[in-house]
A protein has these predicted regions:
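Phosphate-binding site recognition
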Residues: 1-175
Length: 175
């Protein structure tokens, strides 16, 4: 039986981001369990030869990568040492996904350096970004060096798609 892919509107947003020349690292904010990780990983697997994935909530040790220098070559060396041979860094063909980035504020600060370096696409996801009182704030928010978008749970149209209602039927109902 063939698996059915969950269609989300954010896939179009991610494709537009990737196709934009000189795009900035992307931050996706949204509530827990709304599909950020699933959507980003699916997009990455379909559009990049190599996916480097760090989930700071699942493995707090990943934060050590960002404790020292935030120079991109140093970060690549640290990620390679931590992740082993599965972490392949090929300019233009590798995406770095920093999941639950709010757990590692310095990873967010590093986005500025990834932007100025330009060799790798970077997406960070977070569910508590900007929540006052959470207590984990970066030294420096990379203002102007990141693109921030919001993601929400399935809307009604996405729900219909997920339940096998054809796009054509949805369009007929809308009209």
């Amino acid at each position: 039986m063939e698996a059915i892919m969950l269609q989300r509107k954010i896939q179009d947003t991610l494709a537009a981001w990737k196709n934009e020349p000189n795009h900035k690292p992307l931050i996706i904010k949204g509530c827990r369990q709304c599909g950020k990780t699933f959507s980003v990983l699916e997009f990455a697997r379909e559009n990049y030869a190599h996916v480097v994935y760090l989930n700071f909530f699942q493995n707090a040790d990943y934060a050590a990568v960002f404790n020292g220098s935030l120079e991109v070559d140093h970060l690549i060396m640290m990620m390679s040492a931590l992740l082993g041979p599965d972490a392949v860094f090929e300019p233009g063909k590798t995406i770095i996904i920093l999941d639950e980035i709010q757990e590692c504020p310095e990873a967010r600060t590093a986005l500025k350096f990834f932007q100025t370096d330009g060799r790798f696409d970077v997406i960070g996801t977070g569910s508590l970004l900007g929540v006052r009182g959470y207590g984990k704030e970066p030294r420096s928010v990379p203002v102007g060096y990141e693109t921030v978008i919001d993601m929400y749970p399935l809307d009604f149209e996405e729900f219909l798609w997920a339940n096998g209602i054809l796009v054509m039927v949805v369009q007929l109902v809308q009209n």
